[in-house]
Amino acid sequence: MRHRKHSNQLGVKKEHREALLANLSKALLTHGRIKTTLKKAKVLRPFVEKVITLAKNGSLHSRRMAISRVRDTDAVHGLFDDKVEQFRDREGGY
């Protein structure tokens, strides 16, 4: 049963939501901070945390999975090569 499995859909279709999250995460990884609405930020947080967890793994497969989610190779390479050291000791809540 899928009761209470509802995630916030932001009032848009699936493709629009995926593109929105990819663009917001690209901006966040590139600039370090962004200005957005509270609802979008609440949906973006677990999305970006999963990408950072992939970066902590550091394998080629993890890099490809992150590129498929964020859809920007430069932002992902910056995360995997430079920024991941900030998050090595943290277990979450980046």
Each model region followed by its residue ranges:
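Structured, basic alpha/beta domains of bacterial-type, RNA-associated proteins
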Residues: 1-12, 16-19, 23-94
